[in-house]
Each structure stands twice: as C-alpha cells, then as structure tokens.
Amino acid sequence: RLFAEMTALENVMVGRHIRTKSGLLGAVLRTKSFKEEEAAIAKRAQELLEYVGIGKFADYKARTLSYGDQRRLEIARALATDPQLIALDEPAAGMNATEKVQLRELIDRIRNDNRTILLIEHDVKLVMGLCDRVTVLDYGKQIAEGTPATVQKNEKVIEAYLGTGGH
C-alpha cells in the first residue's frame, strides 16, 4: 500500500530505506554519512520514478495520482529494494486500455533488465503477450503449465477461461 499523504518520491524512498546503513542513531543525529545516504536514496528514487514513467510526479502526493500511476509508483517502490524477484499481484486490475498498454511496456522493460517477474493476473491477453511460461489455476488447482502457445490450446484452459467456461 502507498502512503497516501506522502509524495511519490517519498514513497519510493521508503522502499529504498531497507538498504540503508546509517541506522536510527545516524538519523537522529543527522550525521554526515546519514545525509549523504539520504541524498543518494533520493537520487535513486527519482531515477526509479523516471524508469516507471512518472518522474514528473515526484512531488505529488500519492493520493492525487491516477490509478495507473499509483500502480507504477508501487512498482517503483518495489524496485527500490533491488529485488531478484518482483511479484505483481493483479497489477492490471481496474486499469483502462491505455494504462494496460503502459503497464505491459513497463513489465517488459523490467523483464528485459534481467529481473524475474512473478505475474499473478486474470487479464489473459496481458499474460499471454508478456510471459515466457504460464501456469493456469482453476479454483486453486493447477490445470495447465507451459508456453503461452501451449497453454492457449489446452482444453481445460479453454473451458475455464478462454471459451464458454463458467468464469
């Protein structure tokens, strides 16, 4: 969850603080190393806002951003931790078509930067267009796994999600 009353920049900085070395004492005493580290964190946070396409909103409160921009802010904050794996749970939920295109481009960019992405998503078009491997669940039970092309031809998947199934 975003901190609604904090700026976009501050939200990303929160994510980066997991990597700090100064500690509480440095923060309380406002030591030189703490100030240098904070400046570096702010710089990296701004870079991440640019990376996800919302750099111009750095000083905007999170609550004022559009729904799609809030999702990108969440992704920037997650990236601030320098994860090996980034899990995205329903990132396209509630997005309009334009926001979904932007999301797809961002996820593709993250993937091309050699980050592993675990995408949990019901938007079949988005999943099939982005993922190298797909695992399909129906009511919590795995019904298919493989490449998007293989999964799309699976009868159980067609019945549950792509065809005339009950979902």
Q: Model regions: which residues?
A:
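Glycine-rich phosphate-binding loops of nucleotide-dependent enzymes
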Residues: R1-H167
